Amino acid sequence: STPNCTEEELIAMNKLIAGIILTSQGISFVHAGEEMARTKEDEEGKLVENSFESSDKVNKIYWDRKVKYKDLFEYYKGLISLRKEYKAFRMNTNEEIKENIHFLKKGVNFSENNLVAYIIDAKNIDIKCEKIAVIINANNKDVDVELEESNWHVMVDEKTAGNEIIETIKDSKVNVSRKSIKVLIK
């Protein structure tokens, strides 16, 4: 569905989508092979959009892609590990979600379209953190977001995801790379 994109751009979009799915509330669902940039092509090399009745050649998983796309595979592992580690990504009720998730506003916290940013107030949900910020940038350029508080630990960026702190941002303004997700914890 994006024929003019480079492989690097497709991988960035894959990471962005995985980040959205695995930081969202509710049950996460990932198709088999997404973590290896799985595609389904027919015998002529054309992309098969609906492979339900296609052959095993189209539908099988090519495990050698796990080696080729090791960085993407590790990114998925990191997102899954982060989701398991922090209960704030897995609230139990609609009321709990409404009470503890607060969306940042365009014109106040950021100026771009195609951006979603929210803070999870985790202090009553998760003993491991006070707050989690999730910023989703679908733009083709980097954007700045004002989080209103400083001293955040970056856990997910455009390259890395997991339970290890990537960097600490002392300022309240956070830069988010193009076509990426950033998750910060305090």
Segments (PLM) and residue ranges:
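Solvent-exposed beta-hairpin/edge-strand motifs
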Residues: 149-162
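Loop/helix patches that line or flank the sugar-binding groove of alpha-linked glycan CAZymes
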Residues: 1-149
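Short, surface-exposed, polar/charged, turn-prone segments marking secondary-structure boundaries
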Residues: 57-60, 89, 160-164, 182-183
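C-terminal beta-strand-rich structural cap/linker in extracellular carbohydrate-active enzymes
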Residues: 167-186
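Short, polar loop/linker segments at the starts of domains and inter-domain junctions
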Residues: 2-8, 162-173
